[in-house]
């Protein structure tokens, strides 16, 4: 049976090229890729090409827990969309669409079987909200 899909989205006040750069640059990813303030992303390595890898280390700041979020890029269409096949086989697809307010960034991903859909949606949305904050700061520069 196919995994249930979950979609999260935000609108960032920057053009698609800038939205793409903030989403795919390792130095930017470590600044937004965590779901709450007691977590962080100390490292990220991104080889942004089909067959390239994505690896982001996500950890609780107190050191109590951490994991590597890993996958392989199956599609890279800059600055429009990318698809990542996660290490457990699930897929995540993110699109960047121009809007009157900047860029709509939408991620649809396969839910995992271990956590509730609500928890997963809330976590991924919180991460996307952090991404939006960075984009807002970027637009003010």
Predicted features and spans:
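Glycine-rich portal/gate segments that line the openings of hydrophobic small-molecule binding cavities
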Residues: 41-85, 104
